[in-house]
Curated annotation (Swiss-Prot):
<dbReference type="InterPro" id="IPR019810">
    <property type="entry name" value="Citrate_synthase_AS"/>
</dbReference>
<protein>
    <recommendedName>
        <fullName>Citrate synthase</fullName>
        <ecNumber>2.3.3.16</ecNumber>
    </recommendedName>
</protein>
<keyword id="KW-0816">Tricarboxylic acid cycle</keyword>
<dbReference type="GO" id="GO:0004108">
    <property type="term" value="F:citrate (Si)-synthase activity"/>
</dbReference>
<comment type="similarity">
    <text>Belongs to the citrate synthase family.</text>
</comment>
<comment type="pathway">
    <text>Carbohydrate metabolism; tricarboxylic acid cycle; isocitrate from oxaloacetate: step 1/2.</text>
</comment>
<dbReference type="InterPro" id="IPR016142">
    <property type="entry name" value="Citrate_synth-like_lrg_a-sub"/>
</dbReference>
<dbReference type="InterPro" id="IPR036969">
    <property type="entry name" value="Citrate_synthase_sf"/>
</dbReference>
<dbReference type="InterPro" id="IPR024176">
    <property type="entry name" value="Citrate_synthase_bac-typ"/>
</dbReference>
<dbReference type="InterPro" id="IPR002020">
    <property type="entry name" value="Citrate_synthase"/>
</dbReference>
<dbReference type="GO" id="GO:0006099">
    <property type="term" value="P:tricarboxylic acid cycle"/>
</dbReference>
<dbReference type="Pfam" id="PF00285">
    <property type="entry name" value="Citrate_synt"/>
</dbReference>
<dbReference type="InterPro" id="IPR016143">
    <property type="entry name" value="Citrate_synth-like_sm_a-sub"/>
</dbReference>
<keyword id="KW-0808">Transferase</keyword>
<dbReference type="GO" id="GO:0005737">
    <property type="term" value="C:cytoplasm"/>
</dbReference>
<feature type="active site">
    <location>
        <position position="370"/>
    </location>
</feature>
<feature type="active site">
    <location>
        <position position="311"/>
    </location>
</feature>
Length: 435
C-alpha cells in the first residue's frame, strides 16, 4: 500500500509462519504513528485481533487530536480550553466542519443558516403523539431524528454538494427535536424556535418557555451551557462517532447515520455516565461517607464503582473536566448554591481524596468530563433523563464533521470488521424428532 503519510525508510516487520512481512509505518502529524496492516489478510491469510479496537486506527482524520497521557484535546489544532473560554458553540461547529475558524462574514452567514433551518416539519408533531407520556426523551429523539429522512427524500441519494447543507440542517434541527422530546415527556406544549436568539439561548427558550410565560435567559447559565456544548462537540473515534462512520460507509442517509450515533450514545458506558455520577453522589449522601465508598470502590468483590473517574483514553486529568469544575462553581454561585449544594461539596471532597490516594494514582484514575457536568445540568433545572439528550446536541456537530470527512476520503471503504471464529467446525443436521 502506498500512502502520502508513509515513510519508505521506516517499516515494521511481522513474522507469520516463517515468512516476514514488511508493513509501512504511516506518520502522524502529531501523536502515535500507525502500522499499515491492510495487506496482511490477503498476503498472510491472517487477520489481526483487537477487541474494542483499542490499538486500531480505523481512519485518517484531521479533526480532533487527543494525547491521553498529557491530558491534551485539540480541535483542528486549537486547544479545547481556549475554544471553551474564548469561542462559542457555532464558531466551533464551523471549525469542525470546514477546518478553519470563520471570518465575521462567514460566521454571520453560518449562524443565519442554522437559525433558518431550526424549524421542523409540522407533521413531525404527530409522530410525538404516538409515544406514551413516560417515554424516555432519548427514545423519542432517536425515532424523530431517524424519521427526518422521510421529510428530506432527496438526501436518500445524496451528493457531495449536499454535505454542507446536510450538516447545517442537522445542527439546526437536533436542538429543536431535543426540546420537543423534553416538552412532550412533561406534557407541555412545544415551543417554536426564536430566530432572534443565538443557538444556546434558543435551546433554553424552547426548553423552559411556555405559551403563557417567557423565559429570561441568565447569561451565566447561557455561557455555561455554551461551554458544555463546546466540550462535548467531538472526541475523535469514540463509540458513537465510529458508529456514525460505519453506518455512513454503507451510503446510508445522514439522518439514519446520526440516529445510530444517538443509539450508541444512549449506552450508560458512553453518554449516560453523567447521570450515573449524580446517582452515585446521592448514594454517598454526605462527606462523612466518602472513605467508606472509596473502600468499596477498591474492593473488587464489591459491585460499587466510582463513576466520573477514569477514561478509556485519558491517563491524566481530562482537560474538559478542569473547565467544567470552574464552570460548575460559577453556575452555583450565580444561583446561590455554591455553599449549600450537597452534591458539589461531596464531589469536591471526593475528588480531593481520590487524587491523593495511591490506588487511584497508580491506576491513573482522574475525574473525567462527566464528573461535574451532571451537577451543572441539575442546577440549571435540567432533569437527569435529558443529560444524554444534551450530549447528543453537542456531539451532532462532531458526527457531521466526521461523516463529511469520511465521504471526502478517497481511501474510505464500507466498514467490514472480521472475526476470530471459535464456534463449531461442522455439524450434521438432525430432524427435530431425532434430537
Amino acid at each position: 500500500m502506498t500512502n502520502e503519510n508513509s515513510n519508505d525508510s521506516e517499516f515494521a516487520e511481522l513474522k507469520i509462519r516463517g515468512k516476514i512481512f514488511k508493513l509501512p509505518i504511516l506518520k502522524a502529524s502529531i501523536g502515535e504513528d500507525v502500522i499499515d496492516i491492510s495487506r496482511v489478510s490477503s498476503e498472510a491469510d491472517c487477520f489481526t485481533y483487537d477487541p474494542g479496537f483499542m490499538s486500531t486506527a480505523s481512519c485518517q482524520s484531521t479533526i480532533t487530536y487527543i494525547d491521553g497521557d498529557k491530558g491534551i484535546l485539540r480541535h483542528r489544532g486549537y486547544d479545547i480550553k481556549d475554544l471553551a473560554e474564548k469561542s462559542d458553540f457555532l464558531e466551533v461547529a464551523y471549525l469542525l466542519i470546514y477546518g478553519e475558524l470563520p471570518s465575521i462574514e462567514q460566521y454571520n452567514n453560518f449562524t443565519k443558516q442554522v437559525a433558518h433551518h431550526s424549524l421542523v416539519n409540522e407533521r413531525l408533531h404527530y409522530l410525538f403523539q404516538t409515544f406514551c407520556s413516560s417515554s424516555h426523551p432519548m427514545a423519542i429523539m432517536l425515532a424523530a431524528v431517524g424519521s427526518l429522512s422521510a421529510f428530506y427524500p432527496d438526501l436518500l441519494n445524496f451528493k457531495e454538494a449536499d454535505y454542507e447543507l446536510t450538516a447545517i440542517r442537522m445542527i439546526a434541527k437536533i436542538p429543536t427535536i431535543a426540546a420537543m422530546s423534553y416538552k412532550y415527556s412533561i406534557g407541555q406544549p412545544f415551543i417554536y424556535p426564536d430566530n432572534s436568539l443565538d443557538f444556546t439561548e434558543n435551546f433554553l427558550h424552547m426548553m423552559f418557555a411556555t405559551p403563557c410565560t417567557k423565559y429570561k435567559v441568565n447569561p451565566i447559565i447561557k455561557n455555561a451551557l455554551n461551554k458544555i456544548f463546546i466540550l462535548h462537540a467531538d472526541h475523535e473515534q469514540n463509540a458513537s462517532t465510529s458508529t456514525v462512520r460505519i453506518a455512513g460507509s454503507s451510503g446510508a442517509n445522514p439522518f439514519a447515520c446520526v440516529s445510530t450515533g444517538i443509539a450508541s450514545l444512549w449506552g450508560p458506558a458512553h453518554g449516560g455516565a453523567n447521570e450515573a455520577v449524580i446517582n452515585m453522589l446521592k448514594e454517598i449522601g454526605s462527606s462523612e461517607n466518602i472513605p467508606k465508598y472509596i473502600a468499596k470502590a477498591k474492593d473488587k468483590n464489591d459491585p460499587f464503582r466510582l463513576m466520573g473517574f477514569g477514561h478509556r483514553v485519558y491517563k491524566n486529568y481530562d482537560p474538559r473536566a478542569a473547565v467544567l469544575k470552574e464552570t460548575c462553581k460559577e453556575v452555583l454561585k450565580e444561583l446561590g448554591q455554591l455553599e449549600n449544594n450537597p452534591l458539589l461539596q461531596i464531589a469536591i471532597e471526593l475528588e480531593a481524596i481520590a487524587l491523593k490516594d495511591e490506588y487511584f494514582i497508580e491506576r491513573k484514575l482522574y475525574p473525567n468530563v462527566d464528573f461535574y457536568s451532571g451537577i451543572i445540568y441539575k442546577a440549571m433545572g435540567i432533569p437527569s433523563q435529558m443529560f444524554t439528550v444534551l450530549f447528543a446536541i453537542a456531539r451532532t456537530v462532531g458526527w457531521m464533521a466526521q461523516w463529511k470527512e469520511m465521504h471526502e476520503d478517497p481511501e474510505q471503504k464500507i466498514s467490514r470488521p472480521r472475526q476470530l471464529y471459535t464456534g463449531y467446525v461442522h455439524r450434521e443436521y438432525k430432524g427435530i424428532g431425532e434430537r
